[in-house]
């Protein structure tokens, strides 16, 4: 009975209070989950799909960074990652806030904002991104129509430039374009520490198995010497990928 009461009480804690209490700056540096990474979040208005592709020298990066819900939007939360921001962003967008309004509210409420990095795309393809002043350099973001790329601890801005160009100039399914963008980012330098994991998540209405749920593509490579190549190989095993991207 006590457990039930606690659960209900916790559910109604205001978002601002909950996020403000998570002050990661007060934690020792070696206890922080730090997803130094590069990612792209995007929307395809023709297929009504939202997706994220991410890679990092971090174990199982997809488990922390990637968040999406069909008809709502997609979110990448990274750097000194606060996983609460993923669901919180989807909840705010589900209530009608656009990408910028959502991001502004989250950042205002988060005590660890200086070491966060977030990319958001909403149900209409509007994007917003934020890079905290204390994210590990090189850190920044680059946005275009229906997408935003962001990264930290990168070899330089050319990583995001290559990702953006790859996404804009490539035709095919959203999953294909996301992975192509990710591969171009790695080719340009990627995470300056190296590589370990990568993930691809694409959602669409009734996109899950037997038209249940929204997970159209959901692939992760959690620990591999060439995670993007392996992610491409796995994605090509399904007909849902719709376009073959060759492992380089």
Whereabouts are the PLM-identified features?
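Positively charged n-region of N-terminal signal peptides that target proteins for export
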Residues: 1-4
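Bacterial N-terminal signal peptides
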Residues: 7-20
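N-terminal nucleophile
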Residues: 22-248
């Amino acid at each position: 009975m006590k457990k039930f009461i606690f659960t209900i009480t916790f559910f109604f804690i205001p978002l601002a209070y909950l996020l403000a209490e998570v002050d990661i700056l007060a934690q020792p540096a070696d206890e922080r989950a730090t997803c130094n990474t590069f990612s792209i979040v995007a929307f395809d208005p023709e297929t009504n799909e939202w997706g994220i592709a991410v890679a990092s020298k971090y174990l199982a990066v997809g488990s922390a960074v990637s968040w999406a819900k069909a008809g709502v939007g997609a979110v990448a939360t990274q750097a000194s990652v606060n996983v609460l921001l993923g669901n919180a962003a989807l909840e705010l967008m589900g209530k009608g806030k656009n990408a910028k309004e959502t991001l502004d509210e989250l950042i205002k409420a988060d005590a660890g904002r200086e070491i966060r990095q977030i990319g958001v795309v909403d149900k209409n393809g509007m994007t917003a991104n934020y890079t905290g002043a204390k994210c590990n350099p090189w850190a920044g973001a680059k946005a275009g129509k229906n997408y935003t790329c962001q990264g930290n601890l990168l070899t330089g801005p050319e990583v995001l430039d290559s990702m953006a160009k790859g996404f804009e100039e490539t035709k095919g399914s959203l999953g294909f374009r996301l992975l192509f963008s990710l591969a171009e980012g790695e080719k340009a330098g990627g995470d300056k520490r190296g590589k370990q994991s990568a993930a691809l998540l694409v959602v669409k209405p009734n996109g899950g198995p037997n038209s249940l749920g929204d997970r159209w593509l959901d692939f992760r490579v959690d620990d591999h010497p060439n995670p993007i190549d392996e992610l491409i190989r796995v994605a090509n095993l399904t007909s849902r990928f719709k376009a073959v991207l060759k492992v380089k």
